[in-house]
From Swiss-Prot:
<keyword id="KW-0285">Flavoprotein</keyword>
<feature type="binding site">
    <location>
        <position position="9"/>
    </location>
    <ligand>
        <name>FMN</name>
    </ligand>
</feature>
<keyword id="KW-0520">NAD</keyword>
<dbReference type="InterPro" id="IPR023048">
    <property type="entry name" value="NADH:quinone_OxRdtase_FMN_depd"/>
</dbReference>
<comment type="function">
    <text>Also exhibits azoreductase activity. Catalyzes the reductive cleavage of the azo bond in aromatic azo compounds to the corresponding amines.</text>
</comment>
<comment type="similarity">
    <text>Belongs to the azoreductase type 1 family.</text>
</comment>
<keyword id="KW-0560">Oxidoreductase</keyword>
<dbReference type="GO" id="GO:0016652">
    <property type="term" value="F:oxidoreductase activity, acting on NAD(P)H as acceptor"/>
</dbReference>
<feature type="binding site">
    <location>
        <begin position="97"/>
        <end position="100"/>
    </location>
    <ligand>
        <name>FMN</name>
    </ligand>
</feature>
<comment type="function">
    <text>Quinone reductase that provides resistance to thiol-specific stress caused by electrophilic quinones.</text>
</comment>
<dbReference type="GO" id="GO:0009055">
    <property type="term" value="F:electron transfer activity"/>
</dbReference>
<dbReference type="Pfam" id="PF02525">
    <property type="entry name" value="Flavodoxin_2"/>
</dbReference>
<dbReference type="GO" id="GO:0010181">
    <property type="term" value="F:FMN binding"/>
</dbReference>
<dbReference type="InterPro" id="IPR050104">
    <property type="entry name" value="FMN-dep_NADH:Q_OxRdtase_AzoR1"/>
</dbReference>
<dbReference type="InterPro" id="IPR029039">
    <property type="entry name" value="Flavoprotein-like_sf"/>
</dbReference>
<dbReference type="InterPro" id="IPR003680">
    <property type="entry name" value="Flavodoxin_fold"/>
</dbReference>
<dbReference type="GO" id="GO:0016655">
    <property type="term" value="F:oxidoreductase activity, acting on NAD(P)H, quinone or similar compound as acceptor"/>
</dbReference>
Length: 204
């Protein structure tokens, strides 16, 4: 099994999403850590989307014209991000919710994945995802409560976006959720215990 592990939290050891993503990887990888590719998207800080930063497989990338050495290095990094995702059997992503949505570093990584003819295609019936055999697990941490039945549902643009974008590629992501982390120590402790239990219930 090839496992791709990504983190997008700006926090270090205090990050709940980083803790949960690491727990998931340990459960899945077991005694085969060499099968894991790890990317810290905050440390790598992929640049935002332009025609020059698109992977070479994207048809729009040709509009960038000839690239200098620095531009080619960015293009090569984009190609690597796409190829790592395509090659992975399982992808584990630590996702904090910032300002109602995902971190911009994670969005920049996702922008490298949506390549027509590689991860999806357009057919007579509309778009078709090409990554349906891939497993994606999201370790999502939220300070407030945004689940069904709460008043904040319309403000939730992290989980909803990720389900939409991976669904577009043919993937139904699994979710390990810790929410209400900023609603007092009691709520935080309950959320962490529930999320850790959910990790233990994941199919290895």
């Amino acid at each position: 099994m090839k496992l791709l592990h990504l983190d997008a939290s700006i926090l270090g050891t205090g990050s709940v999403s980083r803790e949960l993503s690491a727990l998931i990887v340990r459960r899945l990888a077991g005694d085969a850590p060499d099968a894991v590719t790890y990317r810290d998207l905050v440390a790598e800080n992929p640049p935002h989307l332009t025609v020059a930063t698109l992977p070479g497989a994207h048809p729009v990338s040709a509009m960038a014209g000839p690239l200098d050495a620095a531009g080619q290095a960015v293009r090569d990094a984009s190609d690597r991000m796409l190829s790592e995702f395509v090659a992975a059997d399982t992808v584990v992503i630590g996702v904090p919710m910032y300002n109602f949505t995902i971190p911009s570093q994670l969005k920049a990584w996702i922008d490298r994945l949506l390549v027509p003819g590689t991860t999806f295609r357009y057919g007579a019936a509309g778009p078709e995802g090409l990554m349906g055999g891939k497993r994606v697990i999201l370790a999502l941490a939220r300070g407030g409560f945004y689940g069904p039945g709460t008043a904040s549902v319309p403000a939730e643009h992290a989980e909803h976006y990720l389900r939409t974008v991976f669904g577009f590629m043919g993937i139904v992501p699994e979710l390990v959720l810790a929410e209400g982390l900023a609603a007092g120590e009691h709520n935080k402790a309950q959320a962490l215990a529930s999320a850790r239990d959910a990790v233990g219930q994941l199919a290895a």
